[in-house]
């Protein structure tokens, strides 16, 4: 029996996932949470084999929770279920220790397949993520600069590229304005850009925003 914890800030999403997973005899939902702090608590209790977690949540985000969980419970399989396109976060989150990354728009059967795969200690690589990784290999060792950003830097980059202000981001991400400004400076330096408009142009030309 695979014990699964579900962490998502939307009650409807958690309810839908629980109903779907209850139809499979080899899976049992043993816990749920609505933010990163509760994800960490589920990991601490040790009642789950797989943590199915969103990355965009209030309080402590899934990004921060993943980092904390892998630091304290490296053997726990954390499967990211996100509404963001794979091109945005998949590679960075896999490097950070996620066992897999699947999009919320995927076929429901892919979720159960992913859970079974990561419960065996293996990585789950969806077809979309596999294509991204293959394109990276085909392109040689030189990766585009944005793929070298940390997950948090990538979050800040994409929000800036969409026109969000530092103040709004600080509030939405539960960070100080100074911290967000520091991330902005790092992103500009790593991408060798000078302004927010440069970030927007870069993101559009690389297909990261529309």
Task: Show which residues each predicted segment covers.
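Short amphipathic alpha-helix used as the core "switch/output" element in two-component signaling
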Residues: 41, 63-75
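Active-site residues of response regulator receiver
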Residues: 54, 82
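Acidic, metal-coordinating helix/loop segments flanking the phosphotransfer/catalytic sites
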Residues: 32-50
